Amino acid sequence: VPQMVYYVYAYTRLVADGTIKAGDKINVDVPTGNFGNILAAYYAKEMGLPIAKFICASNDNKVLFDFFQTGTYDRNREFILTTSPSMDILISSNLERLIYKIAGNDAEKNSELMKELTTDGVYTITDDMKAKLAEFYGGYATEAETAATIKKVYESDDYIIDTHTAVAATVYGKYVAETGDKTPTVIASTASPYKFTRSVMNAIDPEYDSKTDFELVDELEKLSGVKVPQAIEDILSLIHISEPTRRVVI
């Protein structure tokens, strides 16, 4: 429920900024593995928010992309560790709620499909159900594409995004190239670059890889102009040098 507020707030900001007029439709682009954040946007639309398209952005664990392409959800695949770990998921538990909706609120059908996922690792929705997914677009970004987008956004806009946001930005570019749809779009930035400092800084310049994690925090602050979050400052304050061994203790 709290995530629904993100999209209502973003819409009101677009109206206030003059980007759109009240009642105009927008698209939303969400990096997701568990399907929770984008489901919140879907529920916001059900409550009246004018959303035209839901762009579901996946990383290399592209089980959701394949589902929207084919109508088959198949978790029987290699699990890939990526630089956007919050999306490293093969069982998108919140997708069940959307399945229930497109099944016509048929709890029995929904239960049948979820049982197939548990026992066989795969299920396929009906053609009628798949037709109800027309407002969704599935896309994915590779690790190389994600890193390239971080670098591109920094160099073109002097703005630093995290790996998950970069997945969404990459997929948005693919969506526009494929469809030509220029509807104003909200890209959900779901994490701080400070949470994935090494991946972000290495994408900007591989030479940063020689620095320690805490040195990278300082470098990120210099590049971004954004103050180090208090939670990280608190961790830094716990570091001390143990005298006689000179070990760093956290």
What are these regions (language model features)?
Residues L39, F68-T72, D127-M129, A144-E145, ...:
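Solvent-exposed, flexible loop/coil residues
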Residues L49-F65, T170-D234:
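Catalytic phosphate/nucleotide-handling subdomain of diverse soluble enzymes
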Residues V1-D17, A22-K25, K101-K182:
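Active-site-adjacent helical/loop segments in soluble small-molecule enzymes
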Residues V63, R97, E108-L113, E145, ...:
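Exposed alpha-helical structural elements
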